[in-house]
């Protein structure tokens, strides 16, 4: 069997288990000839075990025969940090206005969730990446 030729890659951020064939997904997939409802059905099945509504990045590969495959990534660190400390958004001026504090334990939970998608060889390196994300949002990391 011949290998399918990938013609396009589409990156989206979609709520887990709650995708709907609406404008955002339709506008992204339509120009490539991919069936929006088919993607939504498969995406919702694959993300059913995740927390409903948490936004997850998905990379869709479109092939020359209009078929597709996709990879679901872990939720963005900023969303996990906001959820962990219960805030709506990060600080507009992260270096002066602090919006909250996060414990090292909560940060390590986020590191363990994000580890498959991070470019880090160890948990301590990943901790530095995630704590940097927290600081850039105006969230203080406990010492």
Swiss-Prot record:
Quaternary structure and partners: Part of the ribosomal stalk of the 50S ribosomal subunit. Interacts with L10 and the large rRNA to form the base of the stalk. L10 forms an elongated spine to which L12 dimers bind in a sequential fashion forming a multimeric L10(L12)X complex.
Cited Gene3D superfamilies: Ribosomal protein L11, C-terminal domain, Ribosomal protein L11/L12, N-terminal domain
GO molecular function, one term: large ribosomal subunit rRNA binding
Keywords from the UniProt entry: Methylation, Ribonucleoprotein, Ribosomal protein, RNA-binding, rRNA-binding
Matching PANTHER family: 60S RIBOSOMAL PROTEIN L12, LARGE RIBOSOMAL SUBUNIT PROTEIN UL11M
GO terms under cellular component: cytosolic large ribosomal subunit
Protein name according to UniProt: Large ribosomal subunit protein uL11
SUPFAM superfamilies the UniProt entry points to: Ribosomal L11/L12e N-terminal domain, Ribosomal protein L11, C-terminal domain
Gene giving rise to this polypeptide: rplK
Post-translational modification: One or more lysine residues are methylated.
Family under the similarity heading: Belongs to the universal ribosomal protein uL11 family.
Biological function: Forms part of the ribosomal stalk which helps the ribosome interact with GTP-bound translation factors.
GO terms under biological process: translation
Stored InterPro entries: Ribosomal_uL11 (IPR000911), Ribosomal_uL11_bac-typ (IPR006519), Ribosomal_uL11_C (IPR020783), Ribosomal_uL11_C_sf (IPR036769), Ribosomal_uL11_CS (IPR020785), Ribosomal_uL11_N (IPR020784), Ribosomal_uL11_N_sf (IPR036796)
């Amino acid at each position: 069997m011949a290998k399918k030729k990938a013609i396009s890659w589409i990156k989206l951020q979609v709520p887990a288990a709650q995708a709907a064939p609406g404008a955002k997904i339709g506008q992204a997939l339509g120009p490539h000839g991919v069936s929006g409802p088919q993607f939504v059905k498969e995406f919702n099945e694959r993300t059913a075990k995740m927390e409903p509504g948490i936004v997850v990045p998905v990379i869709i590969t479109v092939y020359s025969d209009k078929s597709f495959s996709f990879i679901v990534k872990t939720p963005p660190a900023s969303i996990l940090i906001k959820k962990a400390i219960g805030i709506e958004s990060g600080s507009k001026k992260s270096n002066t206005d602090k919006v909250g504090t996060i414990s090292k334990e909560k940060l390590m939970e986020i590191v363990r969730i994000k580890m498959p998608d991070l470019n880090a060889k160890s948990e301590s390196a990943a901790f530095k990446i995630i704590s940097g994300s927290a600081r850039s949002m105006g969230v203080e990391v406990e010492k």
